[in-house]
Amino acid sequence: SLPSLLTRLEQMPDYSIFRGYIIHYNLASAIESADAYTVFVPNNEAIENYIREKKATSLKEDILRYHVVLGEKLLKNDLHNGMHRETMLGFSYLLAFFLRNDQLYVNEAPINYTNVATDKGVIHGLEKVLEIQKNRCDNNDTIIVRGECGKCSQQAPCPLETKPLRETRKCIYSIYFMGKRSVFIGCQPQCVRTIITRACCAGFFGPQCQACPGRGQNVCSGNGFCLDGVNGTGTCQCGLGFNGTACETCTEGKYGIHCDQACSCVHGRCSQGPLGDGSCDCDVGWRGVKCDMEITTDNCNGTCHTSANCLLDPDGKASCKCAAGFRGNGTVCTAINACETSNGGCSTKADCKRTTPGNRVCVCKAGYTGDGIVCLEINPCLENHGGCDRNAECTQTGPNQAVCNCLPKYTGDGKVCSLINVCLTNNGGCSPFAFCNYTEQDQRICTCKPDYTGDGIVCRGSIYGELPKNPSTSQYFFQLQEHAVRELAGPGPFTVFAPLSSSFNHEPRIKDWDQQGLMSQVLRYHVVGCQQLLLDNLKVTTSATTLQGEPVSISVSQDTVFINNEAKVLSSDIISTNGVIHVIDKLLSPKNLLITPKDALGRVLQNLTTVAANHGYTKFSKLIQDSGLLSVITDSIHTPVTVFWPTDKALEALPPEQQDFLFNQDNKDKLKSYLKFHVIRDSKALASDLPRSASWKTLQGSELSVRCGTGSDIGELFLNEQMCRFIHRGLLFDVGVAYGIDCLLMNPTLGGRCDTFTTFDIPGECGSCIFTPKCPLKSKPKGVKKKCIYNPLPFRRNVEGCQNLCTVVIQTPRCCHGYFMPDCQACPGGPDTPCNNRGMCRDLYTPMGQCLCHTGFNGTACELCWHGRFGPDCQPRSCSEHGQCDEGITGSGECLCETGWTAASCDTPTAVFAVCTPACSVHATCTENNTCVCNLNYEGDGITCTVVDFCKQNNGGCAKVAKCSQKGTQVSCSCKKGYKGDGYSCIEIDPCADGVNGGCHEHATCRMTGPGKHKCECKSHYVGDGVDCEPEQLPLDRCLQDNGQCHPDASCADLYFQDTTVGVFHLRSPLGQYKLTFDKAKEACAKEAATIATYNQLSYAQKAKYHLCSAGWLESGRVAYPTTYASQKCGANVVGIVDYGSRANKSEMWDVFCYRMKDVNCTCKAGYVGDGFSCSGNLLQVLMSFPSLTNFLTEVLAFSKSSARGQAFLKHLTDLSIRGTLFVPQNSGLPGNKSLSGRDIEHHLTNVNVSFYNDLVNGTFLRTMLGSQLLITFSQDQLHQETRFVDGRSILQWDIIAANGILHIISEPLRAPPTAATAAHSGLGTGIFCAVVLVTGAIALAAYSYFRLKQRTTGFQRFDQKRTLMSWLLASSSPRISQTLCMRPQRRHPQSPPVTPSQTLENRIWRTATLWGHCGPDMRSQQATTVTVPR
């Protein structure tokens, strides 16, 4: 690193005096505190000369400050001609830079030594001390502004471009928390804003404050005043009698120091001006003091020159005197050259031009202006800013010469300047985790990136990401990592009380907690879920429940917050994207820690019933067992499970009749439904996960929800709208986790849902038979592999491989008998008596719910009889045309005869015609006993009969939710709004069952909220009003956890969230519905890392109740859409796949159905091949990953150390540009006491091509690296099982893919063919020694590989400094080999055969050997110094 300022100056002895003054005035710290600086340092000689000339004793501090520019590191190339910069002395003291004859100057001092770098700045050497130039008198005004009101402990920031003062004001602020507004006394910062008004000192003018004209230090020669100031022109306004550019002379005809005396010469030349005395030199022919007397007599008798006058002195003596403008003795006169001496009194920047004898005119030279006596350089900057950009400074550099330099924060040539985008340098001062957005107003806006929060200057990520950044909380983070507590990586919000790192050293119980597996509970006890509690929130909160389940108390003493009355909050409000961190001074200890017995691999040993009995849930456990549900819950197709257990106390508190119902064996089916509602399948949910989802589907089929507590229940969890409270958390058993609750869950639709579980098989991805790819997400391996074709390498296509057969379990929504439609409404007549037991309900999972009535019945609920039928059984009864039947369900079947007719059916005339007096009503019948009886549906005395008002009697037989109306004797019933039916039986209309999701978005759930009413709610990971739903930004990159389950040597990319059903999802063009051609559809799926779904894949989704009324493309140009229930609006009541068939015109416009069974995209890194979930390196790396091949590996590495051919062989295994096939003997076929020659080893590699197992044809030969050939043969056993051999060695495992070839495992090593006899090698002793070391190293390698790899699945692991046994093999001339061997070995695939090591570690005696090599200086962290090898 570069030295500091003082250190660098110490290395420059010629500049030591200036360094001494910096120390004397203590300026180094002030200079070094700036982000950057530039110092102009005069050498020792220059300082000594300056002090001597000024007769001073030392340099003043102001002079040193005048040599320093802060905030910029100005290299020589940055010092532009005409540029100005403020100095450390103040903004009014500027340095100017000029380039003259290729020499760079600062002010008037040449820069002779440049670009001496320091850690933060640069030094330039000078040959002259800079004299302070004070030509600016800028005004520095300040105004006081107030910041925002906030907590006094965390002062609110001042507004932009202001600085805080020490003084603060008391203020009041409020916080709305948990439904209540709290008021606090806070502090408001006083901030100062500095406003600089540029101004020139008196006597200076223009933008750069140049000096006004004048002689010496006198402005306008002291004879006038200057038009000065920033906007001044520098023109002198002369006083009375004065004239000239600098008021340096008198007006014509005036003389004297005040130019107030007038000349009186009439015919002569006056001695005028400030230095004149007013005397007259007379012209030819005139004489006298005023030259007003004409000479008429020549007293000199013609002896005078023609340009002379003959004058008489007082004595009367005549003499000749040259006239004005001439000089001589009078007899000889010559014209005076006024320009002859001192340029005629003109300026040195003027030309003196003779006019008449003795006279001249002064004309300023080109580039200058003035009266000739005073000539000033023309400043082009004063007119039109010298042609410079308005954001540039124009600096005069010579007569009528100027340069343009863009102002700070601007760039360009000065003629055109544009704002510098500050965001391009150091991200504009924004956080590295922020976007810097540049505005045209020379401002930048810092905005934190997604997944970060803050003001843009400081941006923080998740709590899990922020904890390790702070040393005081890093130990808490490492404990979270070590004990797999990953909740804080989730979306939150959380409140974390992070103990100081040092507090872990002061807690003696940590060791016991760790050994008993309790540490994760202790760590969770420091986290409150569901709420982000800032310091002000804590001050008004008394307790909060932690993720561990126990509460912590919160108290305030002397304005300090304490947790559990013991841990002090040291720092607070470290806000992150998913919550807030408060640092506390000690570790918190929960009171109730649950010990969970586990085996050596960390698996929970106790089953559900044991754990339930241990924690007070025996009654619910017994119900599960008695109902036969235990085997269902523990079935592998459902595990892992999350169970909500009502306590024994909660079940005992149920009403007796409900307890009788639960424990009655006759109600086992209903009991199962209750119990299933307490189980979530295929999920082992953490407490923090439960509130994140809007709902959780239960094993019973209905949904339940978990919500966070409100009010005083901070951190508490409740089920189903706070019906049940969580009282125990994280009760682990062998196949899941349980949560204790304080009540039995009751669902409004309970009894109506009878979901079924459908399983079907899907093929997994095709890959190597050794490392067969995992099953897709949400599916499980069935334990069966199928042959398939795949493309493992970029240089090879269509290789036979294997794929897992994977089982997908679908929970199929289904209604119980007597219920129908998606929400399982009861059939007409009720679930217990559907269709009143007089018909069959079209129930289960259909939207119909219609009753198919038995013969004789009709009506919505089969509640009516056919015409002519009566009674509960609607039996037929026939009255003649002369009678009226009392029919219907409640009718008696009796026939009421007309007058004159009788008998049961009114088909017999009466013997005597009845006569009634008075006459009967027209609505009555005169009976045989001469009595009037009102007809059916009428009432009265027979004489007067009125129609019965049936609507007043039991609503006329109509349903309660129907309107009864009557016209005459006819009653009509009509269901009210929101209901449907015949009026006698009405059922609720479910708008969600219209076939088009109730008008909700396809990514929304339609929920019936009442008869004919519904609500649209966007699904998880979508936002909107339900009618329109857009994907929300995922709260967390799924690649951040365990690399998204990708291989360590793969790159993980989080895919855009899609609402999939068994991998199928629907895509629509941004342009709207049905805007995709077949080709565009394929592109749209590809952008989502998906493929176009096949017909079978869409069928699987339909089985999983995927219903979407929108047709889309399928593979092969087919178009279809799925329906799961009959609807006239969607598919014309077709249930299944509505198939439009394969389209001949692929340019038709449809939507598309895509297929993707993964959430992340895994891609093997450069130099690796695979599907991303499994990645293979080069042949050597793959060889190193197999513990069963370590003996051959040892031979290869020893060969590489022994000869150049060995190094070449190793290079073949690591060079990705060279491909080959490697046959490797397993350890059992190559015991440690046997060895291979170099030729033998080369005989195992074919470097001509890559030969897969199916490429090995019976009777063919393969050429090896040695140049020899290998014979391929086949054989079959009695069961016709084929075995392939290479030179008689059976191939045991094959097609193990590497990035540069393929590997086959064989039973025994191959032996190279013999060669001609060779001379014995010399150096036998040395060879033996090397052999001993190599053999022992090989044994060590085998042991190490077994020990290392038996504990974990394969994957390239970095060698540990303390544990690596390989580094002794790494000394090689090939950088590629060293690089390869220093890489981590590949992780062994879980489905690889078990490893049987040839020897065990326990029987080894170890010793230490010195390393032969290392992994290079760039791999020091992986390098070892010693290696242990067995004797």
From Swiss-Prot:
Provide an example Pfam family for this protein.
Fasciclin
Gene Ontology cellular-component terms for this entry are: cytoplasm; external side of plasma membrane; plasma membrane
Cystine links in this protein are C212-C226, C220-C236, C238-C247, C259-C270, C263-C280, C282-C291, C300-C310, C304-C320, C322-C333, C339-C352, C346-C362, C364-C375, C381-C394, C388-C404, C406-C417, C423-C436, C430-C446, C448-C459, C827-C841, C835-C851, C853-C862, C874-C885, C879-C895, C897-C906, C951-C964, C958-C973, C975-C986, C992-C1006, C1000-C1016, C1018-C1029, C1085-C1154, C1109-C1130
Q: Which compartments is it annotated to reside in?
A: Cytoplasm; Cell membrane
The family database entries (InterPro entries) matched by this protein are listed as: C-type_lectin-like/link_sf (IPR016186), CTDL_fold (IPR016187), EGF-like_Ca-bd_dom (IPR001881), EGF-like_dom (IPR000742), EGF_dom (IPR024731), FAS1_dom_sf (IPR036378), FAS1_domain (IPR000782), Growth_fac_rcpt_cys_sf (IPR009030)
Record GO terms (molecular function): calcium ion binding; cargo receptor activity; hyaluronic acid binding; low-density lipoprotein particle binding; low-density lipoprotein particle receptor activity; scavenger receptor activity
Domain EGF-like, residue spans: 296-334, 335-376, 377-418, 419-460, 947-987, 988-1030
Q: How is it modified after translation?
A: Glycosylated.
* Bilayer topology: Single-pass type I membrane protein
Keyword terms of this UniProt record: Cell membrane, Cytoplasm, Disulfide bond, EGF-like domain, Endocytosis, Glycoprotein, Hyaluronic acid, Laminin EGF-like domain, Membrane, Receptor, Repeat, Transmembrane, Transmembrane helix
How does this protein assemble? Answer: Interacts with GULP1, heparin, alpha-M/beta-2 integrin (ITGAM and ITGB2), and thymosin beta 4 (TMSB4X).
Protein name (database record): Stabilin-2
Organism of this sequence: Rattus norvegicus (Rat)
Lineage, broadest ranks: Eukaryota, Metazoa, Chordata, Craniata, Vertebrata
